Amino acid sequence: MTTRIDIRFAELAKQGRSAFVTFLMAGDPDPATSLEIIKALPKSGADVIEIGMPFTDPMADGPSIQAAGLRALKAGMTLKKTLELVRGFRKDDNATPIVLMGYYNPIYIYGVDKFLVDAKSAGVDGLIIVDLPPEEDDELCLPAMKAGLNFIRLATPTTDDKRLPAVLANTSGFVYYVSITGITGAAAADSSAVSEAVARIKRHTKLPVCVGFGIRTPETARAIASHANGAVVGTALVDALKNSLDADGRATAKTVNAVAELTASLAQGVKGAQQAAE
């Protein structure tokens, strides 16, 4: 199978540049504004879009993304509405890859088979499920692959050479390397450590390696993108969104632009990595 993710990374490889991957929470701060923001991302330079599935117990998320999930849940966001959001995005954009990121519980409650059918028909390309290890591939990973979706796995600084083959075995689309141990948004990524880690992962796989956690500025994005096939930014974009809201946590006239402008700035950083290499 070839997905939009595979096509996008092949296109970028031909251009000799890394992907800029954005993360935002579905339904933050409300479903309508969320769709407007996500539609603005590709125009601002996003190559791949990760969309968080709001969940009440997000153990890997830092305070910013946890708060985004709570705002979305308060606004009535559900997994069904998250798929509707993707469907709405696909009306105008059939090329930009969409990855849903989150936890297994909401999918399990929705029903795995139903979810996979609905996700595929909505226009989802891949899944990142942070609390399903390789030992549980039968639960969702293998059915997702059969349904034509990429299953993207996380590798971390503590994933050693003994563990890495198991992590990579059924991974497709790309590998998501978590550059720091801990929760999202905690610290800055170290580009020299990232360089070594990406090289180590690439000894085990031909898949693109994207790096996330700890990228907040165009400078860091550029440094990371020079070592990896993609740089993922989430917390910084979620913070820009939050800082544009009114005192009651509602969207303002500035909200969409606040996220779009930071996206454009970070995208320039990622694209600068290619120019620096030339």
UniProtKB/Swiss-Prot annotation:
Enzyme Commission number, as recorded: 4.2.1.20
This protein's UniProt keywords: Amino-acid biosynthesis, Aromatic amino acid biosynthesis, Lyase, Tryptophan biosynthesis
One Pfam family, short name: Trp_syntA
Location of the active site: E50 (proton acceptor), D61 (proton acceptor)
Gene Ontology cellular-component annotations: cytosol
Listed InterPro entries: Aldolase_TIM (IPR013785), RibuloseP-bd_barrel (IPR011060), Trp_synthase_alpha_AS (IPR018204), Trp_synthase_suA (IPR002028)
Keyword Amino-acid biosynthesis (UniProt): yes
GO MF entries: tryptophan synthase activity
Source species, domain of life: Bacteria
Recorded catalytic activity of this chain's protein: (1S,2R)-1-C-(indol-3-yl)glycerol 3-phosphate + L-serine = D-glyceraldehyde 3-phosphate + L-tryptophan + H2O
Keyword Nucleotide-binding: no
GO BP annotation list: L-tryptophan biosynthetic process
UniProt pathway annotation: Amino-acid biosynthesis; L-tryptophan biosynthesis; L-tryptophan from chorismate: step 5/5
Signal sequence residues: none
Subunit structure, as described in the record: Tetramer of two alpha and two beta chains.
Its biological purpose: The alpha subunit is responsible for the aldol cleavage of indoleglycerol phosphate to indole and glyceraldehyde 3-phosphate.
Family: Belongs to the TrpA family.
Identification of the protein by name: Tryptophan synthase alpha chain
Lineage of the species this protein comes from: Bacteria, Pseudomonadati, Pseudomonadota, Alphaproteobacteria, Hyphomicrobiales
Gene name, Swiss-Prot/TrEMBL: trpA
